[in-house]
Amino acid sequence: MSKLTREGFRAMHQQAAEALERSRSSLNVLICAGTGCIASGSMKVYENLREECAQRGLQVYVGLTHHGDAEKSLHIKMSGCHGFCEMGPLVHIEPLGVMYVRVKPEDCREIVERTLLGGEVIERLTYHQDGVSYPRQEDIPFYKKQHRVVLASCGASDAENLEEYIAKGGYTAFEKALFDMDGAAICREISDSGLRGRGGGGFPAGRKWESVRRHTEEPVKYIVCNGDEGDPGAFMDRSIMEGDPHSVLEGMMIAGAATGATEGYIYVRAEYPLAVKRLQVAIDKAAAAGLLGDDIMGSGFSFHIHINRGAGAFVCGEGSALTASIEGERGMPRVKPPRTVDQGLWGKPTVLNNVETFANVPNIINKGAAWYRGIGTEGSAGTKTFALTGNVVNTGLVEVPMGATLREIIFDIGGGIPNGKKFKAVQIGGPSGGCLTEEHLDYPMDFDSLKKLGAIIGSGGLVVMDEDTCMVEVARFFMHFTQNESCGKCTPCREGTKRMLETLERIINNEGSLADLDLLESLSDTITDTALCGLGQTACKPVMSTLRNFRQDYLRHVVDHHCPICNGRKRRLEIKPELCKGCGKCARNCPMEAISGQPRMPYVIDNEKCIHCGACWGACPFGAIDAIEEE
């Protein structure tokens, strides 16, 4: 096989683009083959569609191959995640623009006969919202208000087809960076774009790349992609690796050209087998085409990419722990300095960014820094992907411009809270993030605005909670996760999180006191100030944000000693006449004026007015107030 040249690559791109255009003369059926839809049965839908087409004499083509009668042929592809996970399995048909939701294998015959052959829309398979049918994907509210940059090809292409990626402009940004720009120019373009790391910290990517580039005395440098997505409920990076793996590879290759690195590592948790498979397929195909390896396109630049599977430890999402794991050491954070850009993997200068950050890079190089700056806010350019989960009508993968509000994401895109329930909170940023309230719904979602609220974007997990959620239980869940995932290296995190979890357990069991709330705050201050790594330093954010924003939930446990949400039963407060001395202290402390009576006579609680805040229970010096359970 002859070596690929720049001219050869351009010819490859031209041929692929022409093949893509020819393929569009026939129907293209895209079946979601992301992890979520596969679990819902999309592979059986794929197989049944092919069988039904074959039985009717339709020619099903693979890849971009196309010839013959367009009316008797079509392409059926397995794509990456479409994002609309609540409605999977999903089938998208182009050029009709039709999307079918919750498709079952037994629906395939009707799809072939009525839509693929008859051009008719099957209304029962379309998405419905508020009594309205939405046959076309672009009209569905979930998609209509998104701005897809990183996810543009996820769900729109065959994730394992290199030719299709190249046909849509893939690897042209790498070609441009390789031949038309030097390392300083690439770093400057990334800096000018305002791209900040999408893994949680929001550190400017261009500045990080430039720091590594300046180590000109060091012949060995590394590019590391963090695909160790450990936040509960997060699946943004997984979906990108599954749905558009070549964009991640291309971003890493451009980073290599910018900094002089020749080796790249993608660190992926072993719980993502489909992502690992598709990344490996992408690496193998890129290498076979001459896009990876030695002396790429005759430029003199060499680059190799390897996949390293992690064991799923949350702490390995921290940079120094991740590099230690790749080196074969136990995944534990290291004291800084030195920073990763100076002494990272095997002690060499290392660029470490996450999957979404690298996936943004090809678009920035091709379209320019000004284009990217035009999206988002002044301090947070571009878009951000979010995994929308919890008590929301439409869970799924969402991409919006930085600065979009929580209201737009949860209500306009996500469809709001199901079953007529009220919104209570949203947890953002995973175990290192915080819980926000209804009053925060109109805050812009960007790095700086969230920092002011004591929260972080993190990798992009959004867990929505309704009125039936006890926020103390939420705090306990995240503290249990963090304590269980603590590497144990530093005492503040190892022991401090254990003490916080014990305190939360005591509160949840209605055995706590107001002093426990002070204890939580004191422990949080100590852990935050003294923990070794960023994960430990932010471990208390879920607890502190719930204590600050939902203190009433804590008071139900430590004052009232009863939480109607946790106990699952209704209850009413009652004053025991045999114990009441008629001092009136309970009435004076009641914020709702729900308690009445005469001095030195038993008082009475009006449970229609009572909000069960526990103020009376805490004020009564005689223990005369009791909670009566009601079935």
Spell out what each predicted region is.
Residues C53, G251-M253, M402-P418:
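Short amphipathic, charge-patterned alpha-helical segments
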Residues V276-M402, G414:
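Hydrophobic alpha-helical positions that pack around
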Residues K3-L27, M43-I76, M87-P89, E94-Y127, ...:
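Ferredoxin-type iron-sulfur electron-transfer modules in oxidoreductases and energy-metabolism complexes
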Residues S157-T172, C225-D237, T340-L345, A387-V392, ...:
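Gly-rich Lys/Arg/Thr-decorated short loops/hinges at beta-loop-alpha junctions or inter-strand turns
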Residues E175-P219, R373-G374, G379, A387, ...:
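Accessory "access/gating" subregions that flank catalytic or transport cores
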